């Protein structure tokens, strides 16, 4: 009986919680550390830019970062991290692009259904228009030579003034990682 239960005891996995801010170095692929470094650099630079420093709290529409790499990267996570930091800074105002359809449906419901108290319903035509569009992309270059792999990521963000089409702010963050496979191993 003891011999039958021994394999189950030795093969069990141990789960641990980790610090989300700790450097993650399991692979050279895009990871949480990269996401945090990108968001920190981009948000810090944008908040220090003349567009934001003018003091009028610009209204920005944040579009999703485009993935131009050869791997799956959750660009929504990048966009969400940047959006959250910008909102929490209080220095800018953001237009909610990803829920615009739901907002329009709710406004229509309040205006036309007859179920919403006229004293509390919100009026159509009061949405705030964005003055700027924050857009960007992430690209990568992967090189292999023997047992070595080099991976380079670059993310670019641009803040475009919607009325003029002028780029009012731009920033990039570069990340390079290297990995050397062991001679023997998996």
Each language-model region and where it sits:
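Short C-terminal domain-edge/linker segments immediately following a structured domain
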Residues: 90-96, 125-127, 164-171, 186
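Short, solvent-exposed, polar/charged sequence segments at loop or secondary-structure edges
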Residues: 70, 76-81, 89, 95-145
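Surface-exposed loop/turn and secondary-structure junction residues enriched for glycine/proline
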Residues: 18-20, 33, 38, 68, ...
